[in-house]
From Swiss-Prot:
Belongs to the QueA family. This is S-adenosylmethionine:tRNA ribosyltransferase-isomerase. It comes from the Bacteria. The gene is queA. Transfers and isomerizes the ribose moiety from AdoMet to the 7-aminomethyl group of 7-deazaguanine (preQ1-tRNA) to give epoxyqueuosine (oQ-tRNA). One of its GO terms (cellular component) is cytoplasm. Monomer. HAMAP family: QueA (MF_00113).
Length: 350
């Protein structure tokens, strides 16, 4: 399948550069995955589309301040490091710029020596394996020296790094935020619980592979980078209970979707406690086994994320919705607006 089938025209001014002042004030497009019908709402209207007995699945990963600026100890050139994945102990898979200046044995110093890294080898797609040395607690030092790893299409400086975290972020380990969750406030989540909507939490640590452009000409030639996921026995039991009682499982974001669909694929359609690495790639033709609805942002043209949404809601429906979003001047990408995609997605229906 040609990746150009997932292209659309996006004016640059619709790429959101900063988050809205209030998380929940973003717009919400509601898309019926069966009919392609569209409604234009605000995010707080999600309360009217979720019902007692439904379950929202949220990814509680926490973004690391994963971008570090350092200098080579000899001869002092500036090096930028982006942490991607912890391998074991203090060894990490990273991206470095400029990569040609970092060879095996190169030592990089950060924060006037508070943190040091030695290159121990190369990694996939031009990456580098670095082993860090420090006194103290690694994540405390990282919190002090690191910057939030905003996507390259965001040019503005982020004033408040908490705005690139969900309010329920807990398990540190992501190189990017699960952005569909950025719209929720603690108050909105509490209102959903009061309505009888269950909240279930999983973890998938987001790597840059999710956002890397598809370089192949056809979808089938593209391979996803693996990302770590975990679902507890408690969450699995809750999801199965919801299913048994006729409720819907609504994933918040493509990361939650990938986690549940990975587990269901690996366990004959069943949801159970599991941990591991997933490189699942969902595009039209994929048959969903676990989810009934999806809350997600508006994604990049020709990205694996728009392919996932197209697998769930039909490519023609999704591209029509995206063209409508452009026409109505929705905000796109990480700090942009949201979609709710489900069957019979009408306000107040059950």
């Amino acid at each position: 399948m040609d990746i150009n089938l997932f292209d659309f025209h996006l004016p640059e001014e619709l790429i959101a550069q900063v988050p809205l002042e209030e998380r929940e004030t973003s717009r919400l497009m509601v898309l019926d995955r069966e009919t392609g019908d569209i409604e234009h709402k605000h995010f707080t209207d999600i309360l009217s589309y979720l019902h007692e007995g439904d379950c929202l699945v949220l990814n509680e990963t926490k973004v690391m301040p994963a971008r570090l600026h350092g200098v080579k100890e000899d001869p002092g050139a500036h090096i930028e490091v982006l942490l991607l994945k912890q391998e074991e102990g203090d060894k990490w898979e990273t991206l470095v710029k400029p990569a040609k200046r970092v060879k095996e044995g190169t030592v990089i110093s950060f924060g006037e020596g508070k943190l040091k890294a030695t290159c121990t080898g190369t990694a996939d797609q031009g990456g580098r394996q670095l082993e860090f040395s420090y006194d103290g607690i690694f994540y405390e030092i990282l919190d002090e020296l690191g910057e939030m790893p905003l996507p390259p299409y965001i040019k503005e400086t982020l004033e408040d790094r908490d705005r690139y975290q969900t309010v329920y972020a807990k398990e540190i380990g992501s190189a990017a935020a699960p952005t569909a969750g950025l719209h929720f406030t603690e108050e909105l989540l509490e209102k959903l619980k009061q309505k009888g909507v269950e909240l279930a939490f999983i973890t998938l640590h987001v790597g840059l592979g999710t956002f890397r452009p598809v370089s192949a000409d056809t979808i089938e030639e593209h391979h996803m980078h693996a990302e770590y996921y975990h679902m507890s026995e408690e969450t699995a039991a809750l999801l199965n209970r919801v299913k048994e009682n006729g409720g819907r499982i609504i994933t918040v974001g493509t990361t939650s979707t990938r986690t549940l669909e990975t587990i269901a694929t690996d366990h004959d359609g069943k949801l159970c406690a599991a941990s591991g690495w997933t490189d699942i790639f969902m595009y039209p033709g994929y048959e969903f086994k676990a989810i009934d609805g999806l809350i997600t942002n508006f994604h990049l043209p020709k990205s694996t994320l728009i392919m996932l949404v197209s697998a769930f809601a039909n490519r023609d429906n999704v591209l029509h919705a995206y063209n409508e979003a452009v026409k109505e001047k929705y905000r796109f990408f990480s700090f942009g607006d949201a979609m709710f995609v489900a069957s019979h997605a009408k306000m107040g229906n059950k």
